[in-house]
C-alpha cells in the first residue's frame, strides 16, 4: 500500500516532464505557463508539508494519507480535462495539496509500523517500487502523450490512487502519536512562511534578486519563519520540535539533501529539454533515456544501505554525493552530437551516486526523529527537499537561460534568443544549429555549477554528520 501511494506520486512527477512540448502546442502555454504548471504543484506541496505531517501524527497517518490520495486522484481527473493553462495550473496546485498529505504519511508509517527486521524488508520493496515508477514513468508518459494526448498523463493517476486507497483500508493498521495539544498558530505561520519563501524562489528568474517584489517576498518569508521558530521554542506543544536540528545527523543529512535536490531540480529542467530539443528525441525516447539512472539507483540502493550500516552514514553519504558530482560533470561534457552511449553513461554514474548517498543520508536524518514525531520529521525532510528542488529550477534555470541567450547570435529574432523551442519552430536550419549549440553550451555551464554544488554537499555531510559509533540498526529509505 505504501508502495502504491509512493508510485502514484513518482509516476506523476516523471510523466509530466515529457509532456512539456505538447502542452506548449495544445494549450498555447508560454514559458511562464510551463514554469507554473510545475511550480504550482511545488508551491502548495512545500507550503503544506509541515502542517500535513503534524496532522498525520495527531489524527492518524493512514487517515491523512487516504484523504490525500482521494484529493490527488480527483485533482488529476480535473487536470486531464483542463481547457487552458490557467485551469491546469489550478488543478496542479490542488494535486500538490494531495501530495502534501500523502508524502509525510508514507515515510512515517514505514518507521512506526514495522520493527527493525521487517523495516529492512519493507524498505527494500518500497525502494524497488519507487525505482519502477522512475523507470516506467517517463516511458509510460512518452507512450501516453504520443498515443493519447497530454491529458492521459493525469488520468493514469486515478486508478493507481483508487487501488492505493482500497489497499490502505484493507491492509494497513492506523498509527498516530500520543495525544497532545494542537498548534494552530504554528501551522499558520509555517504555511505562510514556506509558501511565500518558495514563491519568492520560483519568481527569481522572472523578477531578479534586486526587484522590489522579490525583496518584499523574501522579507515577509524571513519575518514569518523567524516568528514561527520563536513560537515553536516557546509553546508547550510545538508542531515541529526544532531541537531536532541540534542533532548533527539530522541537520547535516537534511542540508546535504537540500543542496542535492537543488542539483536534481536543475537536472530535470535542463535534461528533458536537451533530449527533445537538441538531440531531437521523441517523448517516448526521452522517457526511455531515464532508464539508466533508475536502474543504476536500484542496483546500488541496497549496497548503499548495507554499507551505511557497516562504515557509517556520514562516509556513505559523502562518497555517494561525490559520485553524483562526477555524473553532473559528465553531463556537462555532452554536445549536440552526443550519442546514446555517452548520455546513458553519464546518467548511470549519476544513478550510482544517488543510490549510494540517499539511503544513508535519509537514514541518518530519520533515526534522529522520535517515533511520536515521525510524521513531522518526515515532513521536514520532504519540505527541505521540495524547497531545494524549487531553488534548483529557479537558479539553474536562470543560469541556463542567461548563457543560452548570450551564446545566440545577436541578429537572431528575439523569441529565438530566449527560447530554443521558438528558435526551432522558425524552421531555419542555420538558426536551429546555432540554438542547439547555444543550449548545449548553457547546459554545460549549468551542469558544472551543479557538480560544484553537490560536491559542497558531500563536504558538508563529511564535516557535520556524526561518524559511525555503534552498529545500531538503521532506518533506511531512499528518495530520488
Stretches found by the model and what they are:
Residues 1-45, 149, 186, 198, ...:
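Transmembrane core module of solute transporters
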Residues 1-6, 249, 363, 422-480:
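Transmembrane-helix exit segments and adjacent C-terminal regions of multi-pass membrane proteins
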Residues 7, 39, 43, 70, ...:
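Transmembrane alpha-helical cores of Major Facilitator Superfamily
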Residues 23-24, 55-56, 140-148, 201, ...:
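Interfacial helix-cap and linker-helix signal at transmembrane-aqueous boundaries
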Residues 46-47, 77, 135, 191, ...:
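Hydrophobic/small/kink-forming positions within alpha-helical transmembrane segments
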Residues 49-186, 212:
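Helix-loop-helix hairpins in multi-pass membrane proteins, especially solute transporters
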Residues 60-69, 85-86, 105-106, 114-124, ...:
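C-terminal module of multi-pass small-molecule transporters
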Residues 119, 159-175, 193-203, 221-234, ...:
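C-terminal membrane-cytosol helix-exit motif in multi-pass small-molecule transporters
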